[in-house]
Amino acid sequence: MEATQFQAMLEERGISLSSQALAQFERYYELLVEWNEKMNLTAITDKPGVYVKHFFDSVSPAFYYDFSEPFSLCDVGAGAGFPSIPLKICFPHLRVSIVDSLQKRIRFLQHLVGELGLKDIALYHDRAETFARQKGMRESFDVVTARAVARMPVLAELCLPLTKVGGTFLAMKAASAPEELKEGEKAIAVLGGEVTATETFMLPFEEGERTIIFVQKTKKTPARYPRKPGTPNKQPIQ
C-alpha cells in the first residue's frame, strides 16, 4: 500500500491528511519496524498490514465521533502508540496523555514523539489502576481510549475512572464485541457509564471486522474503583 492510497481511504471517510501528516505516518512506520527489531512492539511489520491494521484502525473512532474540537484524550495501554498517535497526527489540536506499564514502550514513544515533532503529548509509565488515583488525573479526560487491551469488564474499570462526567470512553474491539458488551454491562453501570452506541465496520481489503463501543460517563465512579493493580483482571465486576 502506498501512503496516497491510505490518504484516499481516509478521505472517503471525511478525514483529510496534510502532506505533513502523510510524512509523519511514513516516518512512524519506519521507526516502528526499526525499533521492533530491538523490542516486541508489534507482530505486524509489513507496510500494508501496519497501515490498515494499525493506522487506519486507530483513526476509525473519528468516523463516528467528532474530533474537530481541541479536547483531552487519554490512551490506556497504548503499546506502540495505538490509537492515540495516529489520532494525534490526524488531529494535531488534541491534548494527548498516554499511559503504559512497560518502560521500554514509553522509551519508544518518547523517541517517536520527538522524531515526528508532535506537541502536547504527555507520556506516563504507570498502570491504569494507580494512574487513576493520581491527583489531577481521576475523572479529568474528555475522551479515554483503549484498543483491545483487556476484556470489557476489566477495560471499564481501567478507563471509566479516568473519564470525566459527561466525557466518553471508546473501547475498540475485534469481532467478539457483542459477547464482551454483555459481559461488561454490570461493570459499566457500576462505574458510572452508559453505552450510547456500538459501531461495527470492516477494515479495508477484508482485513477483519472491528467494533467501537461508545460509553458515556453519566455519573462519578465510586471511590473504591479502580481496585489494586491486577485485581480488575483477577476478579472482574460481573
UniProtKB/Swiss-Prot annotation:
Keyword Cytoplasm carried by entry? yes
Molecular functions per Gene Ontology: rRNA (guanine-N7-)-methyltransferase activity
Q: Where is this region: Disordered?
A: 219-238
Pfam family of the protein (one): GidB
Name the coiled-coil region(s). none
Mind telling me which InterPro entries this protein's record contains?
rRNA_ssu_MeTfrase_G, SAM-dependent_MTases_sf
Give compartment(s).
Answer: Cytoplasm
Protein name from the UniProt record: Ribosomal RNA small subunit methyltransferase G
Q: Name one GO cellular component term.
A: cytosol
Q: What class of enzyme is it?
A: transferase
Q: What is its EC number?
A: 2.1.1.-
Ligase found in the keyword field: no
Cited function:
Specifically methylates the N7 position of guanine in position 535 of 16S rRNA.
Q: Which family does the record claim for this protein? A: Belongs to the methyltransferase superfamily. RNA methyltransferase RsmG family.
